[in-house]
Amino acid sequence: MSQDKKTPLYETHRTLGAKMIPFGGWDMPVQYSGIIAEHNATREAAGLFDVSHMGEIFITGNPKSILLFLESITCNSVASLSDFQVQYNAILNQNGGLVDDVTIYKFSSEKYMICSNASNYEAVTEHLLEHLPISGVKVDNQSLQWHQIALQGPKANEIFSKFLKRDLDSIQYYRFMLLPYQGEEIIVSRTGYTGEDGFEIYSSIPIGLKLWNELLEFGKPYGLLPCGLGARDTLRIEAKYPLYGHELNDQWTPIESGIGWIVKEKENPYFSSEKILFQKKNGVPSKIVSFALTEAGVPRENFRVLDSQGNEIGKTTSGTFSPSLKKGIGLALIQSEKIKDGEPIQIEIREQPKQAIITMKPFIPGSIRKN
């Protein structure tokens, strides 16, 4: 008997015919109508994802104390956030590895929310509590009290605007608003994990269940489909987004993990800041890069990466067949000296080397709003 936790939408997923799999300690839908159909719906119209397994951790207290605390354990500049802005960040351990990659929501100088990965929110909470200042800051893990769904795709804005009967254009990319729905205030954030425009919507559990069912029905004429983890994975790999446990872990720094763009110099030092800033300036022996196959084959995790002479230069961290590009693509940790856009490499699939190239440019243009 599975001991995996179930999201509040578990029975709804079963009713919709979802295939369920264990993921990060949760029993989650991997697909409904099919991964490719769900992927294409999100790229061309819209997809609805259950992400209520994610963590919500609230940080409240004295403004100065909160800011000093958050700045000391992250590599991006929390100080640069304005109210109702969201930031992609990494919570670091003392060796410069990642406890988790997170999004930080600033409600006010006295209140922040950290959205963390499902498998990590307990570790994040423990890490925060371990390094909490003596006074002035409170950490409250509310992960099991919140419901979260993600509406993603080029028609997401039209669908949700008409559903709520209000203009949502004022919510810019990586911003959020508190909006009334069914007598409750919900968090509507213009963020996502697909490379498309869309929203991540936080609410109470009863409202979340109602919102999922009503939104799914309302969006049908627009081509909205419920989507599982399978499509979520193909979409995020096409968008070159990392996944904890694959491109990110507690050993690799943000520079090695390919998210060096979030590493900032700050007024005060943070965990391993000297090491990480040195790496950003001087480079690292290996780092995450993306690749595309130039012949038939589907790459997966932990396949050997070879140079054109057949020498091993790295390992794949994620791989899939891209429904949009109709070829195998992926991410890999590769020796930095070998990284060059268009550089021929080989991915060893079932002991057979398959031709590929390193791809520094985006796989897909996407429809993310940068306003």
From Swiss-Prot:
Alphabetical list of PANTHER family matching this protein: AMINOMETHYLTRANSFERASE (PTHR43757), AMINOMETHYLTRANSFERASE, MITOCHONDRIAL (PTHR43757:SF2)
Catalytic function, reaction form: N(6)-[(R)-S(8)-aminomethyldihydrolipoyl]-L-lysyl-[protein] + (6S)-5,6,7,8-tetrahydrofolate = N(6)-[(R)-dihydrolipoyl]-L-lysyl-[protein] + (6R)-5,10-methylene-5,6,7,8-tetrahydrofolate + NH4(+)
Function according to Swiss-Prot or TrEMBL: The glycine cleavage system catalyzes the degradation of glycine.
Keyword flag Transferase: yes
Keywords linked to the UniProt accession: Aminotransferase, Transferase
Name under which the protein is recorded: Aminomethyltransferase
Superkingdom of origin organism: Bacteria
Pfam families assigned to the protein according to its UniProt record, in alphabetical order: GCV_T, GCV_T_C
Keyword Transferase: yes
An example molecular function term from Gene Ontology annotations: transaminase activity
One Gene Ontology biological process: glycine decarboxylation via glycine cleavage system
